[in-house]
Amino acid sequence: MSSTLNRLIGLCLCAAVALPSAAVFGASSAETHDLVVYGSSPAALTAAISAQRLGKSVVIVCPETRIGGLTTGGLGQTDIGNKSAFGGLARQFYRDVAAHYRAPDSWKWQKRADYLPDGQCAGTHGDESMWTFEPSAALRILERWEKEYGLKIVRGEYLDRAKGGVSVADGRIVSFRTLSGRVFRGKMFVDATYEGDLLAAAGVSYAVGRESNATYGETLSGTQVANARHHNFVDGVDPYVVKGDKASGL
């Protein structure tokens, strides 16, 4: 009887020691960074690079193995009229595209001289840039950025959207867990997915589609049928707080 009791006491003592140790291990196993970026879109990479330039520790966590989102997944046409609106790393990307296609061996299917010298692929005056590209070229550029900037990208990690998968305190994301069990903590988080997966899992409210005019007391939300061609505003839109008064500010 006494030997059995001794065994039970011993097991209880072991459990009492082991449980706190397990809790401490779980906390210490979390990876902590100044900035945690979820997603692998171009926005994810540029956010990470910008933060690293400021001396911050950064990790990109993404479910994909192929980084770059739509840019490397098939959307190789940049549909924008005013290209001078681009700057920073976005502009650098298009300059890198131009540099890629200056190499003769980049042209496998046709000659460079035969490929749209004007139109959407033309750069702005005095700037070496190219605005259409193959997704494989975009992938090559972004993977080179990954190496050049020393980005830490954790691929193949899906956000655990079950209860407790995202830890929030005082309205701020503290950490999130992936389906593999890894935990990522950060001082700041960036949701660089296209669908807003991290923010939705954190409890941020969202709407699917377009709100009606009544939701926020607006007049131009919802589905508009008037002036539908090109979706342009009618003439006469005034940008100032007080109509016609520049001094009132925008």
Question: Predicted regions span which residues?
Answer:
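Rossmann-like dinucleotide-binding core of oxidoreductases
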Residues: 198-250
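Glycine-/small-residue-rich beta->alpha transition segments that form the dinucleotide
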Residues: 188, 192-197, 202
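Conserved N-terminal/central alpha/beta ligand/cofactor-binding core
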Residues: 56, 62-167, 207, 215-217, ...
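N-terminal Rossmann-fold NAD(P) dinucleotide-binding loop
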Residues: 44
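Bacterial N-terminal signal peptides
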Residues: 8-22
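Core beta-strand elements of the Rossmann-like FAD/NAD(P) dinucleotide-binding domain
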Residues: 31-33, 180-188
